[in-house]
């Protein structure tokens, strides 16, 4: 039964993260990014607050960390998720997902410089492979599109950096609040904040919103935003972070194939070839220090 639960959680996380990028692209077809992100969080927050009540999880962070909760609302939710939708309107889903698949690599680099975390030789090799692969993927993609989508790529890289920094800062502050507490109130704050900003700078016209864009926003909020996040954190509790993070290797493939199916796009050959070294590099950065020692000990 335990193995079945793990497989189901792994499958659910892979599907939700893989479909997130195509849903973002559909959402911004007719809805401005600020407004789409705001409604996404406003749709998710009531369910998260209800879950908080049912599970008796506090909405507020512990004393001494409540300013950090506001900081998270802005720099983990409001800004990066808006940048992700904005970037997704320029960049295809497969490239967007490849960029975010490098999250473990960036977290490791920031942890090394900010928390003085040790990096073993295998992880260093993985970092080099992953970063070089990402560089060439972005360079080739930019050249193929005549550098049209550079704003989108920059937005996605900034969103990636913001998420990685907050993740490392949570480690530094020993922020061990439940996943529901982490998401519930910041989602509500971000939803209100972004919706207000949108009315001033985007002037959204609901009459122009397509049905599929509206459905995509609610899918992002109620399914990806709740099921995906909760499933990933529960998966981390049942298996090591190394095995849980293998999801980062799977969801770019799902995003790529969905884009082919929905938008009838042909996947470029270089994208297929670069998946192998990119996945290898990310996998090597996730390997814990004692992994090979345990293998050698077991073989003896």
Swiss-Prot record:
Name listed for the protein in its UniProt record: Uncharacterized transporter BUsg_270
Family stated for the protein in its record: Belongs to the EamA transporter family.
Matches recorded under InterPro entries: AA-Vitamin_Transporters (IPR050638), EamA_dom (IPR000620)
Transmembrane segments: 4-24, 31-51, 68-88, 95-115, 120-140, 146-166, 177-197, 214-234, 242-262, 272-292
Its membrane topology: Multi-pass membrane protein
Annotated keywords: Cell membrane, Membrane, Repeat, Transmembrane, Transmembrane helix, Transport
Domain EamA: 15-139, 161-287
Superkingdom to which the source organism belongs: Bacteria
Coiled coil location: none
GO cellular component, one term: plasma membrane
Compartmental location: Cell membrane
First-listed, main subcellular location of the protein, grouped into a coarse class: membrane
């Amino acid at each position: 039964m335990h193995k079945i639960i793990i497989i189901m959680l792994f499958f659910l996380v892979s599907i939700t993260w893989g479909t997130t990028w195509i849903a973002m692209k559909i959402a911004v077809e007719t809805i401005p990014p600020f407004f789409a992100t705001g409604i996404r969080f406003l749709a998710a927050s009531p369910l998260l607050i209800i879950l908080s009540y049912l599970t008796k999880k506090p909405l507020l962070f512990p004393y001494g960390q409540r300013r950090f909760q506001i900081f998270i609302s802005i720099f983990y939710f409001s800004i990066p998720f808006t940048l992700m939708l904005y970037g997704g309107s320029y960049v295809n889903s497969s490239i967007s997902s490849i960029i975010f698949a490098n999250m473990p690599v960036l977290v490791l680099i920031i942890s090394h410089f900010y928390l003085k975390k040790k990096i073993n030789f295998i992880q260093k090799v993985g970092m080099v492979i992953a970063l070089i692969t990402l560089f060439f993927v972005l360079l080739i993609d930019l050249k193929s599109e005549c550098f049209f989508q550079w704003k989108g790529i920059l937005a996605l890289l900034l969103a990636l950096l913001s998420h990685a920094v907050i993740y490392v800062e949570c480690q530094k502050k020993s922020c061990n609040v439940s996943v529901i507490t982490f998401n519930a109130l910041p989602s509500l704050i971000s939803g209100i904040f972004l919706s207000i900003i949108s009315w001033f700078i985007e002037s959204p016209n609901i009459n122009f919103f397509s049905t599929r864009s509206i459905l995509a926003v609610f899918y992002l909020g109620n399914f990806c935003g709740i099921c995906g996040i909760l499933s990933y954190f529960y998966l981390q509790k049942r298996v090591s972070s190394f095995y849980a993070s293998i999801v980062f290797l799977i969801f770019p493939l799902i995003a790529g194939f969905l884009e082919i199916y929905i938008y009838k796009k042909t996947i470029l050959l270089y994208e297929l070839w670069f998946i192998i070294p990119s996945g290898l590099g990310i996998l090597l950065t996730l390997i814990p220090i004692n992994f090979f020692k345990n293998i050698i000990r077991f073989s003896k």
